[in-house]
């Protein structure tokens, strides 16, 4: 049975919610799934004053965890069109795994959130995907089998490069039903690919 890691960073809970949906999709495909988050780098008093969501249940990952999975699906909110520094800092520690080829052939994917439709969703996804390709991973996006990314009936996230959500400038918008469906679909397709490649 394929083992899938949903690895995320979420300051305000939007990506945490998306991570849970990604995991649901991967489980529906028959994979064993763990959800873990990367360490917070912001000092506790600053995070509290900034109203970060500090009660997230997912355990904190270690870099060596990555080698234990057949698929790794990475999610983080955007920071100026790229992944958050917390996720970048974590992935930057994977040099030892990269040098050993420990991640070659694993399946990977990315998901993100932005405040606005044009807040850098695709560039953020590319910033994650670039890392996965350097690690030697097989990248799977959100293919057009998920018709929800084609809708014009609502403001919605989603791209062939990965599932996304739009939070609104003040963060009050939560992931929509369509965005969560896209996250589940991507999780399922990545898990199905991992099962085909790794059993």
Curated annotation (Swiss-Prot):
Gene3D superfamilies per record: 3.40.50.360
Binding site for NAD(+): 12
Signal peptide: none
Family as reported in the entry's similarity comment: Belongs to the WrbA family.
Reaction it catalyzes: a quinone + NADH + H(+) = a quinol + NAD(+); a quinone + NADPH + H(+) = a quinol + NADP(+)
Cofactor(s) annotated in UniProt: FMN
Ranges where the Flavodoxin-like domain occurs: 4-190
Sites where the protein binds FMN: 10-15, 78-80, 113-119, 134
GO CC terms in record: membrane
UniProt enzyme class: oxidoreductase
Parts of the chain that traverse the membrane: none
Protein name: NAD(P)H dehydrogenase (quinone)
Gene Ontology molecular function, alphabetical: flavin adenine dinucleotide binding; FMN binding; NAD binding; NADH:ubiquinone reductase (non-electrogenic) activity; NADP binding; NADPH dehydrogenase (quinone) activity
Record text on cofactor binding: Binds 1 FMN per monomer.
Enzyme Commission numbers on file: 1.6.5.2
